[in-house]
Amino acid sequence: ISIPGAYAALEADRALDEGLSVFMFSDNVTIEDEKALKEKAHSKGLAVMGPDCGTGIIQGVPIAFTNNVAKGSIGIIGASGTGIQELTTIIDRLGEGVTNAIGIGGRDLKAEVGGITMMDMIDAMEDDDTVKVLVIVSKPPAKEVRDKISARLSNFSKPVVTLFVGEKPEYHEENFYHAYTLDEAARLAVGLVRGTKVPEATVDVDESEFYKAEDGKTIKAYYSGGTLANEAAMLIKDAMNCKVPPEDVEGYMLQLDGNVVVDLGDDAYTQGKPHPMIDPAKRIECMQEAVDDPSTGVVLLDIMLGYGSHA
């Protein structure tokens, strides 16, 4: 369903009445409608993926903004479209594949919704014999929702990797692994499928090209993916040894001493306008401003490729 949010809930309700699960790209659906639809879907043995869900792979078939990756034995559930895209492409690059990647919408793990679709999809992944390893990706859930999910995953019959972007885990549990970055989550999942550790990625850089602290240069990061922006802000703060709490005001994940990380896919920038994965006009405008700013040392971007992107 991809129509204005004011009408999307009604169409989703009709689809459920017809015995159909719903993939809802529409945003601006009230959280009350979201909860009601998901409760109805649960009672019927169906699922509502969304609202504001832009990515999915079902039995190897891509839906919406998705990459053409190999089919395999890793299942993913995510409250993050670009997070799912990044995970699936890294898994594919490492030589493994994905059977199902289910987007649940960014609000499913809020207290008001209670993780209804997440819990149902965990059950579905456990019942699916083609799934050998499960990966969960989202921003940190509401505490009561997190406790419920963690209790369920602790009794999951297959290895699980969780990534709550912004948290820095310090330990793993038996058959229950906790990742810090999307790359780590993908490598853990691939390693669990193969039964062997996958080495970390390495990047060779020429430090002579680095700016010095006294140069006073800043990072301007303009992202189309919310999870990728969140991860970039987290890693930049870590590198700067900065304890500033996370932001999410009008898409700003970081604003510190001239350094900015912005999610241009935030609702603040997409009201009545295409998402930047479809139309990069807003990002081009921001990039020009950054280039014109003499303090800019680095312009940082994500480039989301795949079906539906930058069409």
What are these regions (language model features)?
Residues I1-A311:
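Catalytic-core regions of core metabolic enzymes
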